[in-house]
Amino acid sequence: MRCVPVFIILLLLIPSAPSVDAQRKTKDDVPLASFHDNAKRTLKRLWNKRSCCPQEFLCCLYLVK
């Protein structure tokens, strides 16, 4: 039971994470979500261009080359 107060004091001494970014964003900073959105959009566009049948997925692999 002697450890509980020490543990609580240690928790209070640990600094909490800042709620605001410490570094300013530059024009090169892009959120990771936009990369995922761009990848999904590109894959969807390529899938529509290939006009593959979903039953035969291998036909899509041959059209990529």
Swiss-Prot record:
GO function terms (MF aspect): toxin activity
GO cellular component: extracellular region
Maturation and modification: Contains 2 disulfide bonds that can be either 'C1-C3, C2-C4' or 'C1-C4, C2-C3', since these disulfide connectivities have been observed for conotoxins with cysteine framework V (for examples, see AC P0DQQ7 and AC P81755).
Compartment(s): Secreted
InterPro entries linked: T-conotoxin (IPR031565)
Keywords linked to the UniProt accession: Cleavage on pair of basic residues, Disulfide bond, Secreted, Signal, Toxin
Pro-peptide region(s): 23-50
Source domain of life: Eukaryota
Tissues showing expression: Expressed by the venom duct.
Signal peptide: 1-22
Entry remark concerning the domains of this protein: The cysteine framework is V (CC-CC).
Protein family per UniProt: Belongs to the conotoxin T superfamily.
Name by which UniProt lists this protein: Conotoxin Lp5.1
Organism: Conus leopardus (Leopard cone)
